[in-house]
Amino acid sequence: MRWFWIDRFSEFVSGKYATAVKCVSLADEVTDDYSPGRPYYPSSMIVEGMAQAGGLLIDQLNDFTGRVVLAKIQSSEFFFEALPGDQLDFRVELEDNLDVGSMVKGTVHRNGELQANINLIFAVLNDERFDKVQLFEPAEFCRMIRLLKLFEVGVNQDGTPILSLIHI
């Protein structure tokens, strides 16, 4: 299974916010299989999309060397379902960033209309217990970041481009 819950980033400002797009398709197995005969994109996958965008926003602050994991869904509110053919626009903002974890708040719009509010808490597994833990194979992680267009749209707060993952 491929772990893409967003299709691409449209904006990415280091340490501030990111916006991303997901085009819901009947070709997505989860859309058709989750509720046979009544296809829709599950809310849990929308949370996963927000977590993917937020986790990368956080991990980029450490040049993608951290082990950022979703720790808790602080709150989520969904107003209607996402259906095949809909475009979901994610916006995630970094609210609080500490060495051990971070908080993000986000919104999702479906075809321009507010579809969800989601607030997430992430943990950063950065102590010696996790030194040998690798969450992603480095080449596959680099491939994922490039496919999501992060380096095409990503900028630092001063407007300079975010550099590629040469160190991985």
Predicted regions and their residues:
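Compact, glycine-rich, soluble single-domain proteins
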Residues: 35-55, 70
